[in-house]
């Protein structure tokens, strides 16, 4: 597997969402991290070649479907806290993922997503993936409707589709997720962009498909 290959090659092993790995599986890495070796049935004892390193990522704020990481694992790792990218970096990420999208429009979509992280009605906002999906969905939705992806209604429907499952309401919030996203969209797109366009639209009166 990837672990044995990385050890034999003396290369980097990257583990995504390490806190979603079952504890009994994760504990296999303890000997690898402390002794640089692992014993595999039929393969025997495997030593890590010089240069072998392991990097793992996790979202500490997402507890659904995650497993407890033991203190023994934490004791063998160094931790770096990584914040969100800057608005400019996120815009570049979105535009790179959806090069057909207008870059100024991508910047506004990123602004919408960044607003979700600080909105008083939301306890969890969206990552840059939400902005990427909004841009991609808007392109596809525009083609299906025979409209430009920059059309305000196309953009709003794309945002509702992409963000409504990602953001979480605070307890006691009186508005729906769709209403909050629509409000944020109108707040961002009501302000004239560099080319003077305004993208404010009315809130949907029914469910968005």
Task: Identify the meaning behind each predicted range.
Residues 1-209:
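C-terminal regulatory/interaction module of P-loop NTP-utilizing enzymes
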């Amino acid at each position: 597997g990837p672990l044995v290959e990385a050890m034999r090659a003396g290369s980097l092993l990257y583990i995504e969402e390490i806190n979603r790995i079952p504890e009994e599986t994760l504990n296999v890495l303890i000997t690898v991290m402390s002794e640089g070796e692992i014993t595999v049935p039929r393969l025997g004892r495997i030593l890590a070649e010089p240069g072998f390193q392991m990097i793992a990522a996790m979202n500490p704020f997402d507890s659904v479907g995650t497993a407890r990481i033991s203190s023994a694992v934490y004791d063998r790792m160094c931790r770096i806290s990584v914040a969100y990218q800057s608005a400019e970096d996120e815009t570049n990420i979105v535009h790179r993922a959806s090069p057909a999208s207008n870059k100024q429009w991508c910047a506004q979509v990123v602004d919408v997503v960044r607003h979700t992280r600080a909105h008083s009605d939301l306890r969890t906002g969206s990552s840059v993936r939400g902005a990427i999906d909004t841009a991609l969905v808007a392109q596809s939705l525009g083609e299906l409707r025979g409209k430009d992806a920059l059309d305000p209604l196309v953009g709003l429907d794309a945002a509702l589709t992409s963000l409504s499952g990602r953001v979480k309401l605070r307890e006691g919030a009186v508005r729906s997720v769709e209403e909050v996203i629509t409000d944020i969209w109108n707040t961002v797109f009501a302000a004239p962009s560099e080319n003077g366009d305004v993208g404010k639209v009315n809130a949907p009166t029914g469910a968005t498909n």
